[in-house]
Amino acid sequence: KVISEELPRLKKCFNKKVMANVSGFSIDEYAYTCEKLDSQEQVGWLEVNVSCPNVHGGGMSFGTDPKAAAQVTKAVKAVTKKPVIIKLSPNVTDIVSIAKACEDAGADGISLINTLLGMRIDLRTKKPVIANTMGGFSGSAIFPVALRMVYQVSSAVNIPVVGMGGVSSAEDVIEMMLAGATAVEIGAANLVDPFICKKIVEALPTAADKYNINELKDIIGGAHNG
């Protein structure tokens, strides 16, 4: 339906290139999906979400193992000419080693972070609120964690880093860029305000002036200097 319905609908509404987010439960499934999307002119980039469980690897997320993440990267790069951005999970002990493994495997960029693992318990039933016990925790509360990981990864790789995780203001975008992000994605905030992206774009010039920034591109990684 993405190819037959969603892409035509998006083209009619925006007529812009889109980034397709790809998930999979096996390396073959990732490769199959990316190969199908490779022929779609409207898809400008592929963002490969390696936070999915590897059904052939004991259920462990591809994104928690440098070797598995690299295998997915290589498989996808073999079937597409489009830029491939690997989206990393924060639920790891060493996100830098995973980012570097993806870079070595041919990734064109790294995006981070996906949701943090969290849970809640219903005090009436004394049971987890989520049927699967744990689930993805997102929103502004995870911004400091995302910022830290963007800072760490951008220091270690030589490919573009896309920052995300709790971004909800022009100031957050500027912080992400100072941490090393060359681009910024917005997720959960769209569910609160569907117009948040437009508002942030419109607010950026004023925020840049406030903090004496002439060109946003000039501040990328600025927090690393000195």
Residue ranges and their predicted role:
Residues 1-14:
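Glycine-rich, positively charged N-terminal anion/phosphate-binding segment
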Residues 2-3, 69, 173, 219:
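Hydrophobic/aromatic residues in well-formed alpha-helices
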Residues 121-135, 177, 189-213:
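C-terminal helical cap(s) of enzyme catalytic domains, especially alpha/beta-barrels
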